[in-house]
Amino acid sequence: MTQMTEKKKPLIILTGPTAVGKTAASIGLAKAIGGEIISADSIQVYRHMDIGSAKILPEEMKGVKHYLIDVLNPEEEFNVAVFQKMAKDAMVEIYKRGRIPIVVGGTGFYIQALLYDIDFEKGEENTAYRKKLETYAKEHGAQALHDRLREADPKSADAIHANNVKRVIRALEYYHETGTKISEHNEAEREKDSPYQFAYFVLNDVRSRLYERIDRRVDIMVEQGLVDEVTALKTRGCTREMVSMQGLGYKEILDYLDGKNSLEEAVTILKRDTRHFAKRQLTWFRRERDVNWIQKEEFGYDEEKILQAMLAILKEKEITD
């Protein structure tokens, strides 16, 4: 009975496709409610990776405390389990100060893992089997490995991009160890109720405008020195096998530096791949439950009106007074 009456802790999610304008919206929201921001971005967590990840600048934070930005070196591993633990630790601190955590970023799987407290690591890790799969990927290519996943677990194959070799291996490993599909396990976990009193905002824009913003953002990154940033990482000893270097903007420029493409080709590929990524992000968010879509064009792109709409929803959900 106590559990029924115990008030859940508040949690706000602010997500959306890449380049939609989450950063500016999140600062406005945090200032308005006294919130603190946890980044749900798989690359901004790394030091020395600023331009390619469109990392928020200290002056853009406007005094709002941020977590999970610049906390790992590029050589370190970062995955959904590490994110979940770090984010939970940050939330303990935020609640202690009587503040509300706002999770901001476009990595839907990370957000889902935190929001529903997903236990996705039940399968025991089998290093020998993983090594076998890694060797297979090196010899036959990422696509051939992905085809094996499609045979074992078609739903996971739809959700995981062929180039994301680590996640493909994890899904195959899970199937090998447990005899069940990781997609079915995750589906069951997703059906759980969230332990939080939450609002899940997805900021979105009309496709043509979003794609224009993506193209412009890539051009700005190149102007700001993306090539120099990737060169410095390469000099540091970072390789394409590292999780950090598989991020958009890094692998494409690495190909250019390795003489596989011209800079012009690398930029074209980066724009195309970022648009595809935005499309996949939106597909993911459409599958999620209890989502509040914030269509920017419906508010005439007025940031104040967008903020007021979010504040009204927070009040309605009794997350704020």
Give, region by region, the residue ranges found by the protein language model.
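Phosphate/pyrophosphate-binding catalytic cores of soluble transferases and nucleic-acid-acting enzymes
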Residues: 1-321
